[in-house]
């Protein structure tokens, strides 16, 4: 069985509208090829199916959450992307820290994926 592509891992499927916030240079190229009809924007209108926010501190994560939520359409997928502890960019963020701090914003973690050797992504869903 082949490994899933990055768009598949991030739930970017055919026809999906995705938004990127603070993505590192070259990240959009990592999403190529996109599934048929999928689009990626840095200027969301509040109707996105998938929203990805890149952060390097807990303060940045907490302050970005309202923008991510505002960009997300009903039933959308919200990802917080952060440097792996094993990467050169690592800092204060980890799965456990994000889980604890973002639960205070009404989000709970649902899944994790590896983006590359530097970045991990945690998917969050609204608390019921």
Enumerate the language-model features and the residues they cover:
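N-terminal, charge-rich interaction modules
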Residues: 1-29
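Glycine-rich, highly charged phosphate/nucleotide-binding loops
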Residues: 34-40, 59-68
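Short acidic low-complexity segments
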Residues: 38-48
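Short, glycine-rich nucleotide/cofactor-binding loops
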Residues: 51-61
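Mid-chain, well-packed structural core segment of small domains
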Residues: 61-93
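Conserved Class I S-adenosyl-L-methionine
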Residues: 92-113
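Class I S-adenosyl-L-methionine
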Residues: 106-128
């Amino acid at each position: 069985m082949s490994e899933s592509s990055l768009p598949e891992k991030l739930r970017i499927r055919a026809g999906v509208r995705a938004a990127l916030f603070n993505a590192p240079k070259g990240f959009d190229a990592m999403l190529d090829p996109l599934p048929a009809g999928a689009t990626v924007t840095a200027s969301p209108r509040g109707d996105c199916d998938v929203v990805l926010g890149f952060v390097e501190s807990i303060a940045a994560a907490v302050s970005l959450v309202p923008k991510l939520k505002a960009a997300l359409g009903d039933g959308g997928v919200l990802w917080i992307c952060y440097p792996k502890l094993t990467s050169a960019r690592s800092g204060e963020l980890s799965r456990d820290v994000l889980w604890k701090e973002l639960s205070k914003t009404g989000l709970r973690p649902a899944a994790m994926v590896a983006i590359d050797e530097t970045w991990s992504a945690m998917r969050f869903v609204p608390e019921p």
